């Protein structure tokens, strides 16, 4: 079970991020979560949207370099310590966390944490064994 994440390579220039959000807005694509990393000359924009395949097409048609990767979405109670529990489980099972970001949706009281790991299938098995609620793509896109 995974969620499609849009990855967009952006030059560090004024207005580049606004070009992306404007294009998605015009295409009626709703952004659910956003995460930006940057370096001196470029950034990587990571998006969870309600229509990932359409978003990729729209952005590529505008000349952006776009890829889709798969991340795991888990629902966590929005209380202190729940993220720590998940990270401890990953660590104790030898799973390398590449990055994560989180958001609180409007259709749930839980926080949603999106994780990119080195072994997605093993992580899903570990989460199931430990009672961690993994969300499917439709649940995340609908939040």
Can you say where each PLM-predicted feature lies in the sequence?
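A conserved regulatory-domain signal marking ACT and ACT-like small-molecule sensing domains
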Residues: 1-143
């Amino acid at each position: 079970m995974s969620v499609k994440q849009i990855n967009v390579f952006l030059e560090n220039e004024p207005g580049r991020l606004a070009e992306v959000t404007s294009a998605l807005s015009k295409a009626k694509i709703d952004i659910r979560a956003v995460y930006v990393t940057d370096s001196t000359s470029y950034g990587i924009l990571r998006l969870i949207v309600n229509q990932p395949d359409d978003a990729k097409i729209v952005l590529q048609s505008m000349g952006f370099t776009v890829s889709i990767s798969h991340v795991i979405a888990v629902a966590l109670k929005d209380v202190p310590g729940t993220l720590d529990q998940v990270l401890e489980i990953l660590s104790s099972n030898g799973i390398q966390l590449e990055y994560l970001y989180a958001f609180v949706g409007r259709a749930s009281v839980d926080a949603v944490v999106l994780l990119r790991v080195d072994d997605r299938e093993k992580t899903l098995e570990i989460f199931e064994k430990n009672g961690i609620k993994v969300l499917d793509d439709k649940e995340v896109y609908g939040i």
